[in-house]
Curated annotation (Swiss-Prot):
Protein name, per record: Minor capsid protein P14
Keyword hit for RNA-binding: no
Residue spans of biased composition, Pro residues class: 146-204
Residue ranges of the region described as Hydrophobic: 244-264
Record-level GO cellular component terms: viral capsid
Keywords linked to the UniProt accession: Capsid protein, Late protein, Virion
Top-rank taxon, per record: Viruses
Region (Disordered): 122-214
């Protein structure tokens, strides 16, 4: 690129500011979208200046193409990629403008070249920094000699434009794939051999019957029942032997208890029996003249209520039956309990 004029430098500064405002919100941007934004911004920058009123359309279009070419030059490193880094693009654009327009003082918003001026109506001036507080005045030193002004640096040569990347060679057409060989027919599966017949199971030995060993019949039947075998007919009714020793012992014990009970009954529970002898009757004769110091006279003719007693009555009372021999009238029926000799028998009737 040739050295730009002051008008082009003013357009470049305005272009850089508007591009920064348009894409600075993103970190990565597609290259195609970056070029579209550059065309729109170039059109706005050129149209909003006074150039549109003083130059022909051909010159205005060339200025637009100049700004677009600058955007392409900045993004040359991303020409083969689909996206680009926004911060890198803005940094390269500012470096390009500094290198191209270092000989011009582009600090004002409006730059004029004769009667032609370039202004940015949409960009406000940068805020001025606040003035620093004035230091206290120091004692004035002696005036030093004024230094000589430094010589202006020689203008830097314009950087050579980067060489355009060589066009990529057209890709060679991919060779046609060789036709695949026809697949070989799958071999027919071999016939499966006939399955061998399963061997016949060995005959099961029949179980022995429990009645073959009568001495262990009950044990054999119990073992079969524990294993769930109830097919033996000899185990349906198991005849139990009679335990004669047990029943004989029970019978002997019963006989002994009966004999012992009989003697106990006769000894303690049966009524005593007395023989009707003359000696017992003579002992029961008492003298009527016995004096008890109370002048009580026991009359032998007193009736004690024993008249009319039959043999059957004595049997009911469990008393001994008197013999056939006549009993003297003075005899008295003995009491159930034995009475010692010489003691009088009181009458059952009240004493008069």
């Amino acid at each position: 690129m040739q050295t730009p004029s002051i008008i082009q430098c003013g357009l470049l500064n305005s272009f850089a500011r508007k591009m920064t405002d348009a894409i600075s919100d993103n970190q990565i941007i597609a290259t195609s979208r970056f070029f579209n934004i550059a065309r729109d911004v170039a059109d706005v920058v050129v149209s909003n200046t006074k150039l549109a009123q003083q130059y022909e359309q051909l010159s205005i279009d060339s200025l637009k193409e100049y700004l677009v070419s600058v955007a392409k030059f900045v993004a040359v490193d991303y020409s083969n990629t689909t996206s680009a880094d926004v911060d890198d693009l803005i940094h390269k654009l500012r470096l390009f403008i500094e290198e191209e327009c270092y000989q011009y003082n582009i600090d004002k918003e409006e730059t004029c070249d004769g009667d032609v001026c370039v202004s940015d109506e949409y960009n406000e001036p940068a805020p001025k920094p606040k003035p620093k507080p004035k230091p206290k005045p120091a004692p004035k030193p002696k005036p030093a000699p004024k230094p000589k002004p430094a010589p202006k640096p020689a203008p830097k040569p314009a950087p050579k434009p980067a060489p355009k990347p060589a066009p990529k060679p057209a890709p060679k057409p991919a060779p046609k794939p060789a036709p695949e060989p026809a697949p070989e027919p799958a071999p027919e599966p071999a016939p499966k051999p006939a399955p061998e017949p399963a061997p016949e199971p060995a005959p099961i030995r029949p179980a022995r019957r429990c009645d073959e060993n009568p001495s262990n019949l009950e044990t054999c039947c119990t073992n079969k029942a524990l294993y769930g075998d109830f097919t033996d007919s000899s185990c349906d009714i198991v005849k139990k032997k009679t335990n004669w020793w047990l029943w004989g012992g029970i019978a002997i014990l019963v006989i002994v208890l009966m004999i012992g009970g009989y003697f106990i009954y006769k000894r303690y529970f049966s009524a005593p029996k007395f023989e009707n002898t003359g000696e017992f009757v003579n002992d029961m004769n008492f003298n009527n003249d016995v004096n008890f110091n109370n002048d009580v006279n026991f009359d032998n003719d007193m009736n004690y209520g024993n008249e009319g007693i039959d043999v059957s009555d004595l049997e009911i009372l469990n008393l001994p039956v008197p013999s056939v021999s006549p009993v003297p009238s003075a005899s008295i029926v003995p009491s159930v309990s034995p009475i010692p000799r010489g003691s009088p028998v009181p009458s059952a009737s009240p004493i008069k």
